[in-house]
Amino acid sequence: MDFLGSTTGSGTLAMLFSFSESILPLDSRSFLLKPLFLRWLSGFLHSVLLLVLFFSWVRKKIRGDSGVTESLKDRRDFGFKSALFCSLALSLLNLVLMSLSGFYWYESGWLDNEQLVSSLGFLLGMVSWGVLSICLHRCRDCEHKKAPFLLRLWLVFYLVVSCYSLVVDFVMYERRETVPVHLLVFDIVAFIAAVFLGYVAVLKKDRSNSNGVLEEPLLNGGDSRVGGDDSVELNKTNGSGEATPYSRAGILSLLTFSWMSPLIDIGNKKTLDLEDVPQLHDTDSVVGLAPKFRSMLESPDGGERSGVTTFKLIKALYFTAQWEILVTAFFAFIYTVASYVGPALIDTFVQYLNGRRQYNHEGYVLVITFFAAKIVECLSQRHWFFRLQKVGIRMRSALVAMIYEKGLTLSCQSKQGRTSGEIINFMTVDAERIGNFSWYMHDPWMVLLQVGLALWILYRNLGLASIAALVATIIVMLINFPFGRMQERFQEKLMEAKDSRMKSTSEILRNMRILKLQGWEMKFLSKIFDLRKSEEGWLKKYVYNSAVISFVFWGAPTLVSVSTFGACILLGIPLESGKILSALATFRILQEPIYNLPDTISMIVQTKVSLDRLASYLCLDNLQPDIVERLPKGSSDVAVEVINSTLSWDVSSSNPTLKDINFKVFPGMKVAVCGTVGSGKSSLLSSLLGEVPKVSGSLKVCGTKAYVAQSPWIQSGKIEDNILFGKPMERERYDKVLEACSLSKDLEILSFGDQTVIGERGINLSGGQKQRIQIARALYQDADIYLFDDPFSAVDAHTGSHLFKEVLLGLLCSKSVIYVTHQVEFLPAADLILVMKDGRISQAGKYNDILNSGTDFMELIGAHQEALAVVDSVDANSVSEKSALGQENVIVKDAIAVDEKLESQDLKNDKLESVEPQRQIIQEEEREKGSVALDVYWKYITLAYGGALVPFILLGQVLFQLLQIGSNYWMAWATPVSEDVQAPVKLSTLMIVYVALAFGSSLCILLRATLLVTAGYKTATELFHKMHHCIFRSPMSFFDSTPSGRIMSRASTDQSAVDLELPYQFGSVAITVIQLIGIIGVMSQVSWLVFLVFIPVVAASIWYQRYYIAAARELSRLVGVCKAPLIQHFSETISGATTIRSFSQEFRFRSDNMRLSDGYSRPKFYTAGAMEWLCFRLDMLSSLTFVFSLVFLVSIPTGVIDPSLAGLAVTYGLSLNTLQAWLIWTLCNLENKIISVERILQYASVPSEPPLVIESNRPEQSWPSRGEVEIRDLQVRYAPHMPLVLRGITCTFKGGLRTGIVGRTGSGKSTLIQTLFRIVEPSAGEIRIDGVNILTIGLHDLRLRLSIIPQDPTMFEGTMRSNLDPLEEYTDDQIWEALDKCQLGDEVRKKEQKLDSSVSENGDNWSMGQRQLVCLGRVLLKRSKILVLDEATASVDTATDNLIQKTLREHFSDCTVITIAHRISSVIDSDMVLLLSNGIIEEYDTPVRLLEDKSSSFSKLVAEYTSRSSSSFD
């Protein structure tokens, strides 16, 4: 670019010298005071600047300077930014004056030498200041404190010339000579800019430590990094280590987007992966953006961001991308002006072809002008679009970082009004929408500029008839407004409906296991379909309204042209073909702002709504930093001190959660907290973490803390990473922690040990394993204070004892520990026991001290003694009941036989598994590679009505194109070239035919638009139903191995693309192809030689498109793949915010979020760059085609071609480059968007579970009547690549008996239950219930006949009624009866809305114990013959456990009850006990017989439990 600029400058200098020679004979003194000399001097000076910049650039390239030779300067330096702004302003001002001079030429000819010299001077000024601006921008990160010597010298000369210009203006004013106002303004502005630039370049002090080596920092373009190593490291996501080539590209590479070529070349050689995509530059990375954005949101007094307003948010976003926004405004202005050059010159071109020539070589000058305008239009549009997308990426990244940061600090009260789905929507919807607003940010002022330029051209050609054009334009805009308003309302309602659907979908996906166990999945699918139906109602209104707007868009030029030409006839203004063609070309350009204005207004409103939502979210209260006074370790002799504290989750409530709390914990103390369900135990721990708002009192914590939550929070990722939790690996300590938490054996069983990847929410781990991993996480932190919220409830008795001994009394013997527990046996070891009741500490002291001092503690002890009495009675009666066990001997013998048989079988299995390939259960998201299969396109096109509408859509567009070309052809042919030529038809005939053709074309476009949205709507609906039906029918293994973020991404982002974008993408391709064929047809009518150029140009375009699409397609896929981890990380962070804060890990998680955010932004950034790389090349090719046609037209003799038809060809040719680029762009965009269909079809073909109902083999209505479960040689594995979990189990559960299943965590207990419900299908063997093989009947026939109380109590958002009876099968009386039986009736009656009392997301407004009682209520309603309890009482106290056991014994006495429990008291009174170990039966007999054998594992377990519990009363 510099080379071209310099050559132009030299040639212009020669021309200027030739003019000066003709002028020099004038009186020298008079000559020096003439404006002509000033413009000549200015042009010469700017030529010198271009030469200096060019030779500096060449010198740098030859020397290979790295560019960074001096220390960096603060990038916020006022002088640098202002210098950049001044350079841009001067370039823009020169452009405006050059344009004015240029248009003057065509009015008055080339005879005025002063005008010519002035115009050339302005041209050189525009180019030189523009190049200087680019150089300044390229070195914005590495500029020196002073400009290079040559540049400073040049600026001094420029200042002198500017002063001289003002002196000349003053002298001319004194002589009463006329000074053009625009030149006077230019001289004043230039002088002010020169003074400032001179100050910045010459007088500003150099604050660097270097000696000012004479280098050219403006041209170095070196890459620099700001922020230190940490920020750089943070920015490096999983990918190429090098920074973006964009930051290191030279000027020519920047202009042509050649910096994208290496990546596109890699994409052609191999399938692109994220590792191939270079890093973002610091200015585009969230690492660099977030601090600046945060500082802009800070209050002026440095306070919290509680005062965030919409205006402050807008201001912060603006300053985050201030430079890019200004540059895009500059390019938008240049593009708008350049796009109107063609229409302005068409009349002159037609007159030239008609023989009316004003000077020699006028035709070639016109061709050069057309070509130059096209080049400027192309360059400005490409860089405008690219930088707009950069702005969008920056805004989105900054907002996501701030939303995430707010989510980490939100108070629990603030969270209550917002579900996690809504908070995630701020990131996935609102932040994206604000980022997309960058496309529309310049439209408001551009509309005024475009309409102004159009009216100016129309006035030059048609005089006062341009007023009619203005009126028609305003009418069309006004017609668009009501449709725009409706579109806005429809979209708002559509988004609300989508939010509701996504919220419900998210909840269902989280709880899919319980839905399948209960047989409710199809009921909840119908709920999703109902929500989608509501969404489809608004979608239909939206798309049909879009069809009307599309009709207005395509019909607008017709209406405006009919009005304008009609006004010409009424006013008697002669219609000449050149003027008409100029007007038609102007109308076509005016079409865009007319169409975009409603969209722009709608987008502004939507963005305002999103900004308001985000501002209100950022204004929510954070956690109070002063709830807990945090003291450094060793600064106090008290570890925890709580004095007269009253705390409440709801500060406005009259009944605080915790009241008058007082206690002290000294270093090394063990404090136990106990109490009934809902007494405030967990709230007490939360208050020490600073989570519960404080009403009064004081809390002090001295030292670091670690927290173990009641509900395990496990991150997706490796087990090792979950335990280390940001700490460096210390192998010795790590091994000790694993041993203390009994994790070593579990890791040995897992194929990948501690490198096993945990699924979402620890889906592939048992409850006990999750609990022990989070205990290990806490231990590894080596904190001073440990807070354990019921850590032993989810593990078996043996493991619980081991944990208590090795963890609390072992590794933590010297630490302060506060632990909540329901197990009384763990209380005596405590130094202090706090008994909670109704939010108060009712008793406090050591075990023996408070044993007889109050009733609350005695109630807990009494419940425990009652449970222990059951164990003792079974043990005592074991001998007397031998004779009653004869009927069980067969079962015992079977079990023994199985054990013998399994010894050899285990060996076989081990060998088999060692050969089988094993993979992680959670795999990287599968993405298609290579080009999108044609089958995907075909399926999309034919899904709606078998593709029957497609031919009619194409026919409508073809007819529209023919009628539109016909109407323009008619106007060109039927109007004279000039006033002295007779018109071939009457004016009335002219308008009647034109109106008829225009009306016909409008009807065709209305037909096409309506059919297109109809087909698109139908296809979107079909794809939605197909995908969701397949997902809900897929086996549980699919959900275990597929993070919900991947499904959510398809249900939201991909579905939105199918709903709203794909129909228009397909339509755009068809429309553009037909338009392009029409243009080629028109141009070939004038010049068949166009084909000689057009054929190779088309071939080159197709080659470029194929070369580009390989990389672009994979980049687009990577965008989709990289979005899911960002959403998933966000979702996990919100659910685990308390744990993250308790470990003080906020910074690390923010860093991870930034890394994932940049990982998502990188492929988006390069997708934008690749698109502009392609469009630039296609624009150049089509511009060459257009110029070839023009050269041909001006080269042939006058009269050979009808000037009117030639003008028509030029009119259509003006849009050739736009259409050709648009065609390739839409093709590429279509292939990128069709990936959404590909991804949806990917999940629409997921293998389904076996049938829900098999009509030919349905069990009897009374089945199962006895409830006998027979298991034969059962083998189970979770996936073909996973090891066996159950390895040949054979046993029988007799009908009507209670069977307890025990075993270490991970022994296969829960797997056995899942197999009974066919959540997991057996690899071998069978299960029979009352003689019916469950594999031969439908899933719903099986699952709806069984009942289960799951390990994790689940409640859905809705009401108490909908949670107890989701299938709506029972009356209110039956529901109340069930609630009373499970002891929840009184609690629900207290609520104002009774059965319609609200249940929040995940049932968070009900305690864990209450949720478990709701699950008990469900099975009481269902009354199945077989009931399974999967560790159902793990989260409740002993008294509540006893209550549940009593209820079950009372109401399920004749049923088969299968109980998995960690509490011995829950299974000791069972009729049979099955003990599993590593997937095989270790023991299976009656509790009495097993207790007789003191060497049995069960006997040892009971003995340990009894001795441990009995010690509580010693």
UniProtKB/Swiss-Prot annotation:
It is found in: Membrane. Pfam families: ABC_membrane, ABC_tran. InterPro entries: AAA+_ATPase, ABC1_TM_dom, ABC1_TM_sf, ABC_transporter-like_ATP-bd, ABC_transporter-like_CS, ABC_transporter_C-like, ABCC_6TM_D1, ABCC_6TM_D2. One of its GO terms (molecular function) is chlorophyll catabolite transmembrane transporter activity. Ubiquitous. Its EC number is 7.6.2.2. The keyword Protein biosynthesis does not apply. One of its GO terms (cellular component) is plasmodesma. The chain crosses the membrane at residues 35-55, 83-103, 116-136, 153-173, 183-203, 325-345, 364-386, 439-459, 463-483, 551-571, 940-960, 987-1007, 1077-1097, 1181-1201, 1205-1225. Glutathione-conjugate transport is inhibited by decyl-glutathione and, to a lower extent, by GS-GS, but not by GSH. All transports are inhibited by vanadate. Residues 325-606, 950-1232 form the ABC transmembrane type-1 domain. It catalyses: ATP + H2O + xenobioticSide 1 = ADP + phosphate + xenobioticSide 2. ATP 2 binds at residues 1303-1310. This is ABC transporter C family member 3. The gene is ABCC3.
